[in-house]
Curated annotation (Swiss-Prot):
UniProt entry tagged with the keyword Cell inner membrane: yes
Name of the protein described by the UniProt record: Phospho-N-acetylmuramoyl-pentapeptide-transferase
The family this protein is said to belong to: Belongs to the glycosyltransferase 4 family. MraY subfamily.
GO cellular component, one term: plasma membrane
InterPro entries in the cross-refs: Glycosyl_transferase_4, PNAcMuramoyl-5peptid_Trfase, PNAcMuramoyl-5peptid_Trfase_CS
Job description of the protein: Catalyzes the initial step of the lipid cycle reactions in the biosynthesis of the cell wall peptidoglycan: transfers peptidoglycan precursor phospho-MurNAc-pentapeptide from UDP-MurNAc-pentapeptide onto the lipid carrier undecaprenyl phosphate, yielding undecaprenyl-pyrophosphoryl-MurNAc-pentapeptide, known as lipid I.
Length: 361
């Protein structure tokens, strides 16, 4: 909004020329989202405590150390959503369609997560919305986003799949691109949701992935940098760096309240929306496969659950002591902070590996 209001006045007031730089607006979005999180955080937490009473239900079959978390409010993802949406709308070019597509996924998935959290609290169990209903709604929203993306993106980028390490390879998926994009967005959303099981565990890898894709968005949206790196140039996607900056800032603000011992949990409101947002940004920038590397920690968590379920159904035996895999390490005797910090390190390493794909071609 500031870009649309102030940049046209740059001829009269030279300082407003700053708003044409995506890097400046990305920094502004980050700081704004951080400040919003700090300001509204205590108020949101007080409100959540007043309406939730006993807080998020704690799994009785989980690690015993988690029982002390009883009474901690959930749905803290609300403060992330508010900070991201307000900051993005304030600093982004409102004429940029890719930003609106990503916001559609972010808000849509956030509403689904909110409904899930609400039912968990009112029914006093850990189930919430049925898995089928959540899946159906997330698929529908992701399908709309994918179709919208195809409609506004020039061919062959619209239905093309870029492959890391190959500079000119763009596989045309045709209409199969829609189910593929749905898989990326819904898969990322659920993978992040599964990762959100310990204090601070999910939000830092989310910030790392957001910062990484903010850089990727900036580079892919810039014809000169894209040409130098020999990655596919998608005009307009540079504005997504502003969104990613807002996500990093909001994440930092949320971490202030989510650091061990957490004052509030993210809940599905935050995890579903943030995961969906990362998936959507990867689709817009043609780096869907790179997301599997950068977000490898999320992939690991999701795969551990699938392996555990498949193994138990087929053999009656469990591969891990408990799934997702972060609980496996807790059961092995690792303290919660040890698991969290080591997983943060893994996320940072994977982000560097993902960034290396931009140059290794």
């Amino acid at each position: 909004m500031l870009f649309n209001l102030l940049y046209p006045l740059a001829d009269e007031f030279q300082i407003f020329n700053l708003f044409r730089y995506i890097t400046f607006r990305t920094g502004g979005a980050m700081v704004t989202a951080l400040l919003i999180s700090f300001v509204i955080g205590p108020r949101v937490i007080r409100w959540l405590k007043s309406v939730q009473g006993e807080g998020q239900p704690i799994r009785t079959d989980g690690p015993e150390t988690h029982l002390k978390k009883k009474g901690t409010p959930t749905m803290g993802g609300l403060m992330i959503l508010i900070a991201v949406i307000v900051s993005t709308l304030l600093w982004v070019d409102l004429a940029n369609v890719y930003t609106w597509i990503v916001l559609l996924v972010t808000v849509g998935f956030g509403l689904i997560g909110f409904g899930d959290d609400f039912l968990k609290l009112t029914k006093r169990n850990t189930k919430g919305l049925s898995g089928r209903l959540k899946l159906a709604w997330t698929i529908a929203i992701a399908g709309v986003a994918a179709t919208w993306y195809i409609a506004v993106t020039p061919h062959p980028l619209d239905t093309g799949l870029a492959v890391p390490f190959f500079k000119d390879l763009l596989v045309n998926l045709g209409w199969f691109f829609i189910p593929f994009a749905i898989l990326v967005m819904v898969g990322a959303s659920n993978a992040v949701n599964l990762t959100d099981g310990l204090d601070g565990l999910a939000i830092v890898p989310i910030m790392i992935a957001a910062a990484t894709f903010g850089l990727i968005a900036y580079l892919s949206g810039n014809a000169i940098f894209a040409g130098y790196l020999q990655i596919h140039h998608v005009p307009g996607t540079g504005e997504l760096a502003v969104f990613c900056g807002a996500l990093v800032g909001a994440g930092l603000g949320f971490l202030w309240f989510n650091a061990p011992p957490a004052m509030v949990f993210m809940g599905d409101t935050g995890s579903l929306s943030m995961g969906g947002a990362l998936g959507a940004v990867s689709v817009m920038t043609k780096h869907e496969l790179v997301l599997a590397i950068v977000g490898g920690l999320f992939v690991l968590e999701a795969v551990s659950v699938m392996v555990q379920v498949a193994s138990f159904k087929l053999t009656g035996k469990r591969v891990f002591r408990m799934a997702p895999i972060h609980h496996h390490f807790e059961k092995k005797g690792w303290s919660e902070p040890t698991v969290v910090i080591r997983f943060w390190i893994i996320a940072a390493i994977l982000a560097l590996v993902g960034l290396s794909t931009l140059k290794l071609r």
